[in-house]
UniProtKB/Swiss-Prot annotation:
Family statement drawn from the similarity comment of this UniProt entry: Belongs to the TCP-1 chaperonin family.
Keyword vocabulary terms for this entry: ATP-binding, Chaperone, Cytoplasm, Nucleotide-binding
Single GO MF descriptor: ATP binding
Intracellular or extracellular location(s): Cytoplasm
PANTHER family from the UniProt entry: CHAPERONIN
Matching SUPFAM superfamilies: GroEL apical domain-like (SSF52029), GroEL equatorial domain-like (SSF48592), GroEL-intermediate domain like (SSF54849)
Organism listed in the record: Mus musculus (Mouse)
Disulfide bonds: none
Subunit comment: Component of the chaperonin-containing T-complex (TRiC), a heterooligomeric complex of about 850 to 900 kDa that forms two stacked rings, 12 to 16 nm in diameter.
Record's protein name: T-complex protein 1 subunit zeta-2
Tissue-level expression: Testis specific.
CDD domains: TCP1_zeta
Amino acid sequence: MAAIKIANPGAEVTRSQAALAVNICAARGLQDVLRPTLGPKGALKMLVSGAGDIKLTKDGNVLLHEMQIQHPTASIIAKVAAAQDHVTGDGTTSNVLIIGELLKQADLYISEGLHPRIITEGFDVAKTKALEVLDEIKVQKEMKREILLDVARTSLQTKVHAELADILTEAVVDSVLAIRRPGVPIDLFMVEIVEMRHKSETDTQLIRGLVLDHGARHPRMRKQVRDAYILTCNVSLEYEKTEVSSGFFYKTVEEKEKLVKAERKFIEDRVQKIIDLKQKVCAESNKGFVVINQKGIDPVSLEMLAKHNIVALRRAKRRNLERLTLACGGLAVNSFEGLSEECLGHAGLVFEYALGEEKFTFIEDCVNPLSVTLLVKGPNKHTLIQIKDALRDGLRAVKNAIEDGCVVPGAGAVEVAIAEALVNYKHRVQGRVRLGIQAFADALLIIPKVLAQNSGYDLQETLIKIQTKHAESKELLGIDLNTGEPMAAAEAGIWDNYCVKKHLLHSCTVIATNILLVDEIMRAGMSSLRD
């Protein structure tokens, strides 16, 4: 009897081989769900929520977040894969597939009597060697636009169809290059992704400026301003209650009127400072003037600004204030004391676009903007969500390539090369540990196998072709998914991120090792006691 049964007779216990079988079964089950989604030719999954909302996706990270996974082992694997996406932005599906395959290959040896500890030691040796091989085959490149286009296209084609991927590729690369500054880490939050349910997904475009999801609040304000000064501020232009508990008291009507006039004058003085600055900078030109405020602007203030041809937007999102100053220049001011021309940014064109009841304000033609906007268009909600998920992965792929300073060939070439290196290396290792190395090598081949299978080719035949040609030529060969034949991935411009592959090898080995060493599963928490 298990020791926990003595302390808690109601506990559920699974031991030894049964525990291992349960864990491997859970990992294989999760692998089977994600297996058909790998690669550019992968299948889509339709997710239907409890409320009836539909989401079509083949993004592993989205699937793992949206699915309700109850099995504890499958849940652990899902969290590890989701962490992979959080750290590197890609490799979620590959993570689940390799973990499942590592456990499957280990199970073959364990069923013949090999102890799990021996297998895990082999996995650790194999991981160390695999990382050495990965460092040898990585390609150091100057990250020019052409290479980044290939990296982005490789990532995006696994998320959306090829025609759309080609359109998104240029937008993604140009947006990262726009916000890139020498010696400063790339901040992808400076790329705003804005949805517009309009036209088709192929109309998605890069705006070298900002798109705000609201418009001006006064009918007399101009809908289009060219060559405009931009004042970004966080100053209230309406009467607000005090932040502390306080009040003003009056005894007569005259005193009340004085209070009202004083409150009004307080706001009007602030508005007048904006008007004075506008008249100063635009006195001898036809330049426009736009005020974008995080706080409110009351109707009287809007009327004053409209009379002087000033376009004013209120209640702008806080995150857009930083983006505005980076895109247009100038400073975000919290007070109108000492307001000067140095505080102003500039945009070549500011215009309002109405789409049904929604309004959008475009701020374009900025000089060297350090913040840009990806305007996602599509006919329906699930298309917009799918494109947004793809764009995030594409942006991360380009960022990773720039920060790594190197790339690795894709299309399964890395896995084939590492697997062959491990098979050759195992003969230099003494004892049964070499069986763990062989299991690791076989598990990595799940990636080229599934890529071939999802493209409609025989997985074993395709793999043998690649391995044979790789052994002869020593080139890094992947699978041409259009023909099923071996191809030089580097020549075809198919590049993966080095950091994704490195993180993948680390995380897969660690989680597979931990699962193999579980010999008892106990469900004896407070919730099961109450049950």
